[in-house]
């Protein structure tokens, strides 16, 4: 049974079902219900949204299981939860609880600075962040069923998510015109498994979905990421740190679905209050940048 449920094909198929949708961070049952009613395809249950994690400092860990369970009981859509990079036990606890996906997340303080989780050893599918094709291929090689840009979480600034999406897409384009010898050299240069790169070259795309995450704060941000080739959008602090979370949630879902309907997006934006306050990425030191976590 577990071999069937835990196969790459099934895990990736589950992630494909979220394609074109919005996944929202929530910290309680009420927020989860708002997200579901707004049209979210899944929710991410956590103790604090990324902007609060950033503001609080210290060590950020897996959410209290009570919070995750509360969210799971409140909605019918899939529920994700975050585990620290390399923290086998946090991931096993979440798997035992029955979450639908685990995010091995740089938003939390890494538990292991050398190794990511061997995601292929779990039954539950994983989502992981990436900034470039090397990171994407390494995570896929470890068993990730879904990818997302790292962006810079909790900033309300889309610039890093844009950079990461463009970087992955441009490297995939370069890869598709390489011969086998060039792929071998490229694999060495970017620290990626040759077999994964060969698979990407043969298919002309990543073998898993790649969502946008890290800095999405407005309907325009969500639509931009879809324009750039994202398979869907994660929204962390952007919704529940806005002036009107319910309206923002619905607007971001609609903008993601109709990302080339600019008149609609304009109308949606005009009816909203103030978005979350953003941070200038250049004012963050390397140590403050969550995207630098992992390898």
Curated annotation (Swiss-Prot):
It catalyses: aldehydo-D-ribose 5-phosphate + D-glyceraldehyde 3-phosphate + L-glutamine = pyridoxal 5'-phosphate + L-glutamate + phosphate + 3 H2O + H(+). GO terms for biological process: amino acid metabolic process; pyridoxal phosphate biosynthetic process; pyridoxine biosynthetic process. One of its GO terms (molecular function) is amine-lyase activity. Keywords: Lyase, Pyridoxal phosphate, Schiff base. The keyword Lyase applies. This is Pyridoxal 5'-phosphate synthase subunit PdxS. Pathway: Cofactor biosynthesis; pyridoxal 5'-phosphate biosynthesis. Its EC number is 4.3.3.6. PROSITE patterns: PDXS_SNZ_1 (PS01235), PDXS_SNZ_2 (PS51129). In the presence of PdxT, forms a dodecamer of heterodimers. D-ribose 5-phosphate binds at residues 25, 154, 215, 236-237. The active site is at residue 82. D-glyceraldehyde 3-phosphate binds at residue 166. Catalyzes the formation of pyridoxal 5'-phosphate from ribose 5-phosphate (RBP), glyceraldehyde 3-phosphate (G3P) and ammonia. The ammonia is provided by the PdxT subunit. Can also use ribulose 5-phosphate and dihydroxyacetone phosphate as substrates, resulting from enzyme-catalyzed isomerization of RBP and G3P, respectively. Belongs to the PdxS/SNZ family. InterPro entries: Aldolase_TIM (IPR013785), PdxS/SNZ (IPR001852), PdxS/SNZ_N (IPR033755), RibuloseP-bd_barrel (IPR011060). The lineage of its organism: Bacteria, Bacillati, Bacillota, Bacilli, Bacillales. It comes from the Bacteria. PANTHER family: PYRIDOXAL 5'-PHOSPHATE SYNTHASE SUBUNIT SNZ1-RELATED. It comes from Staphylococcus aureus (strain NCTC 8325 / PS 47). Signal peptide: none annotated. HAMAP family: PdxS.
């Amino acid at each position: 049974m577990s071999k069937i449920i835990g196969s790459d094909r099934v895990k990736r198929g589950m992630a494909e079902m979220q394609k074109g949708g919005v996944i929202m961070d929530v910290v309680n049952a009420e927020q989860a219900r708002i997200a579901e009613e707004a049209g979210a395809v899944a929710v991410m249950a956590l103790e604090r949204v990324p902007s609060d994690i950033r503001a609080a400092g210290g060590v950020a860990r897996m959410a209290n299981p009570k919070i995750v369970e509360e969210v799971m009981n409140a909605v019918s859509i899939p529920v994700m939860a975050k585990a620290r990079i390399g923290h086998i036990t946090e991931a096993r606890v979440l798997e035992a609880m029955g979450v639908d996906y685990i995010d091995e997340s740089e938003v939390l303080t890494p538990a292991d600075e050398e190794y990511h989780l061997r995601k292929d050893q779990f039954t539950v599918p994983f989502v992981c962040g990436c900034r470039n094709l090397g990171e994407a291929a390494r995570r896929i090689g470890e068993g990730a069923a879904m990818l997302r840009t790292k962006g810079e979480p909790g900033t309300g600034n889309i610039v890093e998510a844009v950079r990461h999406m463009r970087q992955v897409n441009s490297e995939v384009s370069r890869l598709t015109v390489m011969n086998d010898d060039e792929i071998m050299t490229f694999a060495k240069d970017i620290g990626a498994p040759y077999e994964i790169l060969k698979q990407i070259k043969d298919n002309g795309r990543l073998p898993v979905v790649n969502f946008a995450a890290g800095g999405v704060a407005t309907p325009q941000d969500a639509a931009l990421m879809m324009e750039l080739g994202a398979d869907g959008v994660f929204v962390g602090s952007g919704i529940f740190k806005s002036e009107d979370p319910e309206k923002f949630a619905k607007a971001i879902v609609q903008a993601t679905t109709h990302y080339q309907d600019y008149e609609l997006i304009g109308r949606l934006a005009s009816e909203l209050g103030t978005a979350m306050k953003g941070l200038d990425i250049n004012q963050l030191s390397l140590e403050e940048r969550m995207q630098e976590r992992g390898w």
